[in-house]
Amino acid sequence: MPIKILSPQLANQIAAGEVVERPASVVKELVENSLDAGANKIQIDIENGGANLIRIRDNGCGIPKEELSLALARHATSKIADLDDLEAILSLGFRGEALASISSVSRLTLTSRTEEQTEAWQVYAQGRDMETTIKPASHPVGTTVEVANLFFNTPARRKFLRTDKTEFAHIDEVIRRIALTKFNTAFTLTHNGKIIRQYRPAEAINQQLKRVAAICGDDFVKNALRIDWKHDDLHLSGWVATPNFSRTQNDLSYCYINGRMVRDKVISHAIRQAYAQYLPTDAYPAFVLFIDLNPHDVDVNVHPTKHEVRFHQQRLIHDFIYEGISYALNNQEQLNWHTDQSAVENHEENTVREPQPNYSIRPNRAAAGQNSFAPKYYEKPQQNQPHFSNTPVLPNHVSTGYRDYRSDAPSKTEQRLYAELLRTLPPTAQKDISDTAQQNISDTAKIISTEIIECSSHLRTLSLIENRALLLQQNQDFFLLSLEKLQRLQWQLALQQIQIEQQPLLIPIVFRLTEAQFQAWQQYSDNFKKIGFEFIENQAQLRLTLNKVPNVLRTQNLQKCLMAMLTRDENSSPFLTALCAQLECKTFDALADALNLLSDTERLLTQTNRTAFTQLLKPVNWQPLLDEI
């Protein structure tokens, strides 16, 4: 078969295979066009799940008569003009493919009128060459797009459509997702002439909460934590649910980049990591998050559906999102959910905020000549917004290189090490201490202190008990080892090393102290520096800036920990013991993770500190139970 240029209709139908997956895809593209046109009132009429009719009516700026024929042409758009615009996209659409692709697989009619025109005009395309026909029509200022008989000329695609109920459910979800990010726009959704959804404009915060409650449910709002987190021109806002409102399926996860619905692995990993210590692996967090950043720092031209994005600084975005959510979860103050005016005051009081230094917000480059799509997050923040004196929690992952998508399964090397750790000693090397097994617990504890811990790997690990302790065996003796106490011992041993590996922070943490706290800091500053912390001190402003932390503590909430250290009773316990007592211990769901902790601690043991490990072993006396059998 010779090489030839495809007809416009066939080329558009091929493109439609990516853009138009189902009726919900059509609704998404057309509603986004309405929003780009500046509409604040959009009506969506659906018949038979969208297979028979999809009608989108808006009150936007409209399309001039002379541009109507281009509106249905492929690669024709008013939203970008050159490569610079493509690298700073602020509009929802920009590819110029949606209308051409939709019109190639349906009977599409577009009616529009601008404010300058005295009459409206209607355009539609038909035939193999997609020739357009324009005629006068009656229509107010704005645009109406009717898509009838979707996939009428591609039977193979049409037969894959699901039931009307299923297809409409997908359309409903698209409108819900868009309504969550466009609070100033009114949406009306009808199906077969019946109003299904109606979202009024939401200007005030209590009105926005009502819309969130209508979409996500009252229970979500009652358990929601407000986030308003900023660093330079990064801005994270929205709501995250407390861990007790976890979901069994990932059905309440809404994330937006510059007002655009996205699915991104970096963002998902940061959110999961922030919830890791609160949720089991089979539970999902609930959230509505808006991430606003300079459009030059994100590439949305990844896929025709524009659901995927790429960040130029993935690590920065990951750690920034983790910080904001972690701080909200660690300082849980739920919204006081009311529908009256007091909801505004309660909402503002319970907003989680980072203290705002005078960051200079860099303006975005205008897209297509004029920045008509610039969202409101680049406006100067209001002066009456409250500010907290607290500072962000330390990022959970600030080391170079991601381990985001590494499998949880142990590697072959780890499996070999686990097997060696679990092996008991040869019979000739085992000490006969069976005589001590019949003595009481106190006598046994005295004997094991000199015999067992000569090498802790002589102990055989039998089981993980309730994710809290390890059951160990040596010959006929059994012991319980608390994993929480083992973690704290590991931290102490690691911080007592001669050379402590430091981890620089991507985003330094600022502490604003009282005079009493600053005096305590001056007393403990040498201790902090000795174990790997690096601060910049500003005595005049009673401020500390944390730049480096011990690598072993990089996953900890050091903001909370260090503030607690500055308010503690100095005579209560030694500095290092008190510091480790403030650290949060992780939970162990797998035996392999607990064995890793035991192995890491063993490597830090020396002849002088083995006694500390010995004291953690609690003998288990099975004799009373055996006597009852």
Curated annotation (Swiss-Prot):
<dbReference type="InterPro" id="IPR014721">
    <property type="entry name" value="Ribsml_uS5_D2-typ_fold_subgr"/>
</dbReference>
<dbReference type="GO" id="GO:0032300">
    <property type="term" value="C:mismatch repair complex"/>
</dbReference>
<dbReference type="GO" id="GO:0016887">
    <property type="term" value="F:ATP hydrolysis activity"/>
</dbReference>
<dbReference type="InterPro" id="IPR036890">
    <property type="entry name" value="HATPase_C_sf"/>
</dbReference>
<comment type="similarity">
    <text>Belongs to the DNA mismatch repair MutL/HexB family.</text>
</comment>
<dbReference type="InterPro" id="IPR037198">
    <property type="entry name" value="MutL_C_sf"/>
</dbReference>
<dbReference type="InterPro" id="IPR020568">
    <property type="entry name" value="Ribosomal_Su5_D2-typ_SF"/>
</dbReference>
<dbReference type="GO" id="GO:0005524">
    <property type="term" value="F:ATP binding"/>
</dbReference>
<dbReference type="Pfam" id="PF13589">
    <property type="entry name" value="HATPase_c_3"/>
</dbReference>
<keyword id="KW-0227">DNA damage</keyword>
<keyword id="KW-0234">DNA repair</keyword>
<dbReference type="InterPro" id="IPR002099">
    <property type="entry name" value="MutL/Mlh/PMS"/>
</dbReference>
<dbReference type="GO" id="GO:0140664">
    <property type="term" value="F:ATP-dependent DNA damage sensor activity"/>
</dbReference>
<dbReference type="InterPro" id="IPR020667">
    <property type="entry name" value="DNA_mismatch_repair_MutL"/>
</dbReference>
<dbReference type="InterPro" id="IPR042120">
    <property type="entry name" value="MutL_C_dimsub"/>
</dbReference>
<dbReference type="InterPro" id="IPR014790">
    <property type="entry name" value="MutL_C"/>
</dbReference>
<comment type="function">
    <text>This protein is involved in the repair of mismatches in DNA. It is required for dam-dependent methyl-directed DNA mismatch repair. May act as a 'molecular matchmaker', a protein that promotes the formation of a stable complex between two or more DNA-binding proteins in an ATP-dependent manner without itself being part of a final effector complex.</text>
</comment>
<protein>
    <recommendedName>
        <fullName>DNA mismatch repair protein MutL</fullName>
    </recommendedName>
</protein>
<dbReference type="InterPro" id="IPR013507">
    <property type="entry name" value="DNA_mismatch_S5_2-like"/>
</dbReference>
<dbReference type="InterPro" id="IPR014762">
    <property type="entry name" value="DNA_mismatch_repair_CS"/>
</dbReference>
<dbReference type="GO" id="GO:0006298">
    <property type="term" value="P:mismatch repair"/>
</dbReference>
<dbReference type="InterPro" id="IPR042121">
    <property type="entry name" value="MutL_C_regsub"/>
</dbReference>
<dbReference type="InterPro" id="IPR038973">
    <property type="entry name" value="MutL/Mlh/Pms-like"/>
</dbReference>
<dbReference type="Pfam" id="PF08676">
    <property type="entry name" value="MutL_C"/>
</dbReference>
<dbReference type="Pfam" id="PF01119">
    <property type="entry name" value="DNA_mis_repair"/>
</dbReference>
<dbReference type="GO" id="GO:0030983">
    <property type="term" value="F:mismatched DNA binding"/>
</dbReference>
